[in-house]
Amino acid sequence: MKPSPRTPAHPRHPVALATFLVFGLAQAATAADDALLAAAPAGQHTLQAVTVTATMTEQEARTAPASVTVVTEEELAQRNAANLLDAVRGTPGVTFQGRQVGGRKTLALRGMEGKHTLTLIDGRRISASDDVIGHSDYQYGWLPMAAVERVEIIRGPLSALYGSEALGGVINLITKKPKDRWMASIGLSGATGLDSDTAADALRTSVYAAGPLGEQFNLAINAEKSYQGSTVLPEDRAQSEIEGNRTRSLGLTASWQPVAGHEVEFGVQDGLEKRDSDDINRTPTYYHNRYELDRTQKHASWNADWGNGWRSQLRAYRSDISIRNFRNNGVAATRPQDMRDSVVDGHASTRWGSHQITVGGEWRKEELVNAGLKNGQDEATHKALFVQDEFALGQNLMATLGLRGDHHEIFGSEVSPRAYLVWEASPNLVVKGGYGHAFKAPTLKQISPNYVGAEGPHSFLGNGNIQPETSNAFELGANWQAAPQLALRATVFHTEVKQLITYRLLQKIGPRSIYQYDNVDAARIQGLEAGFTWDITPRLQWNNDATWLHTRDKTTGQQLNDRPRVAWNSTLVWQVQQWRTQLGAETTGKQQSASGELPAYTLWNASVGRAWKLGGERQLHLSTGIQNLGNVRMQEESPNFGWAEQGRRFFVNARMDF
């Protein structure tokens, strides 16, 4: 007999509970410290965010030719971020879409699917597995957060620089770099579910160390091991609602400066992740389901400053991901799959009068091993050249023009132009906007005419005539420091997407449907991002960012599925010297799914953190808090949600820097 569904555990007043927790703790903390510490002036703790992703050159995010959000190392710790999804949640334009398996979800930028976001590590692309492997979310665990200095999020197309996949935007994980002396940090993070039915325990340990080896050599090492338990499905406790996982990763980077201005770097990042869940198939048969994901990225690079404004970079790197599935009770496992991306790229930049010119190229070979392909494998080669010009049109007006040409050995060529203007109207007002074309190449499964995927109840066939997905996007935005204590920001955007790849029904043979990949859909996505940061007092700051979306499937005339009409993130931050206390709310509005309309919901999070100086370079960082204060369970909000969230959990993070 199956157990009855549990009674919803939503507190009647989660806001009151959160406010008491956060500001009660903060009041106690400040009372203890006020005799020794003076309040920090507003903004004293905030450094100007920088980005290298928008143009491949470092510049302030405020005046960069793109819509940019930078998540700092401090914010990663405060969010208890275990992976990239945790790192970017709560940032403007980011929402989630379900993968229907194991509680998995992927991110969407401005309503564009996860497959339309290019993920980079220090500018190096990783294997884009989410569109190749069904129901997967494997792109978000390539790098431990202990090795990350910041995460740069670019909303809007950037194929003019990076090529395929950058329709919705680019997320670039910037790793920590060695300093002129040895530095190290040891981290320990734990979480425990306050309701064992909805949240599972977790534990994560990490080590990072970097420093010089003599005058010309540097070394950086990162290691992490983590455990996340699975949660049961309350309606059937023999099944898992959220899969568990165990991970271990190790990274090593060595660099050499043979002469001033030149650096040669070699590195490897390796990780193994094991996921476990209990499931049921259509028979119905209960079975234990395990996935093993083996990820490796190796790279070599040469960065050179030639003087007189000339700089160059040359890189070679390879990304590999191997997926293996194991099932018991006579249930057939999914096919083994191996993906490899081998890349050689480079670019050079120089100043020429008021122009900053960047030219570069890329050669990339993607390979896929899958039994559904002819001879069990396939490959495709990409070649590209690009040019970018940043120049002044006046004292306070900057223009960025870019053009990239990509050639794919199967479908042919695609040209991606870009034009952007940034007007610094005053020291307090920046207006910027532009246009960009972007594309996503078909996967090897989609474009291979001999591919047959027939593992589930349906069959999917490749199509040698398929074309890349393309988009044309426009945006116009402004950032205004309206008063010393108030910053306002807003951006409108409009995107036309064509040649969207989906599948069409060819025929039915008994209960089995036969589908073929094809370009059949077109869509329009437009909306508004707006927000403000208000220093209510020198100690108290209120951040708000909201995104309104209007979407349309131009083939059917219907709203696109899994795109919330409104997403609103609100955070109160109380900062007193080393103390940082915050209360956050992530509200996701109503949205349409394939099974009907999904209701709006809000996740509340609260945390308190502090850093202690222990003498010399030693610092102790502690943070603690509660995630999902309201204990929201997606399946109780609606059974049509395609993913799950951990229930109410208490967490503690500790990190020692020395």
Segment roles from a protein language model:
Residues 84-87, 105-108, 119-120, 137-141, ...:
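N-terminal periplasmic accessory domains that precede
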Residues 179-291:
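Periplasmic-side early beta-strands and strand-to-turn transitions of outer-membrane beta-barrels
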Residues 272-274, 372-376, 409-414, 423, ...:
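Surface-exposed extracellular loop regions of Gram-negative outer-membrane beta-barrel proteins
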Residues 283-305, 337-340, 424, 437-489, ...:
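Outer-membrane beta-barrel signature, preferentially recognizing the C-terminal barrel domain
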